[in-house]
Amino acid sequence: AKVGGIHANNTYPAEFIYENLMIQTNIIHNAFLNGVKKLLFLGSSCIYPKYANQPIKEDELLTGKLEPTNEPYAVSKIAGIKMCESYNRQYGKSHNIDYRCIMPTSLYGQGDNYHSENSHVIPALIRRFHEGKINNASSVSIWGSGKPKRDFLYVDDLASSAIHVLNLEKKIYDKHTTQMNSHINVGSGVEITIKKLAESIKEVVGYKGQINFDLKKLEGSPRKLVDNQRLNSLGWKAKIKLKEGLTKTYNDFIINKCLV
């Protein structure tokens, strides 16, 4: 998938909707044509309305307007869910296919894109605080007020959840989903404000300066915490705490010299 933070989504909307639609359409359809019986589509919690009820249950999908800054990306991901559901409905029995969908919340971890503007919030802040530290900068700027709340999921937990969901017996998966609402949320279950997140990253990196909040910049949805009850009832919970995940991610940044 083509992914990025608020700046990238807002700056390159055509690329985000076109590339994601093309990627998933080609993969899902060609998987079907080539006899792939089981497939897992990864969506995003961006699929839900900007002002969805919190924590966000799976049935909040298509109940309201999306966050404008990432609407093209969200629409492409919604299309991917509906494509999987449609193929299941039309070809599930005749071709014995089982295409499933999970919706992870904000991801982070090793191998991320650490671009200071086009990446997601955690890798972007890791880079900004690191550069602030080595340059002895008096302050580091953060987009928005710092008040929005997010749920962050470490990449290893995502991988674990993907394997767990894919390995579920079909009758069990079907029991917890419906034909027209077949996706499953994946999150840590813990929310944190962007302000507190920035303070945590500052501590992990070892930056000693101040944090400035740029109120002129975009900050997205005010709150985005997914409800994990469906996945928890299927026997899975996230294991990696935020502080541990941030430390591992910063170590990855340092080891791989991700200054591009």
Q: Which ranges hold each PLM region?
A:
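N-terminal Rossmann-like NAD(P)+-binding domain of SDR-like oxidoreductases, especially those catalyzing
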Residues: 1-113, 248, 255, 259-260
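Glycine-rich, phosphate-binding/catalytic loops in enzymes
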Residues: 13-16, 55-59, 118-120, 159, ...
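Conserved active-site region of classical short-chain dehydrogenase/reductase
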Residues: 21, 25-29, 82, 123, ...
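Mobile, glycine-enriched helix-loop/loop "lid" segments at the mouths of ligand-binding/catalytic clefts
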Residues: 46-55, 119, 124-133
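Short, flexible, glycine-rich and Lys/Arg-enriched loop motifs at helix boundaries
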Residues: 53-55, 59-69, 129-142, 146
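Hydrophobic alpha-helix immediately C-terminal to the catalytic Tyr-X-X-X-Lys motif of short-chain
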Residues: 79, 83-87, 121-125, 197
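Short, solvent-exposed loop/turn segments at secondary-structure boundaries
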Residues: 112-117, 153
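C-terminal substrate-binding subdomain of Rossmann-fold SDR/epimerase-dehydratase oxidoreductases
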Residues: 125, 131-260
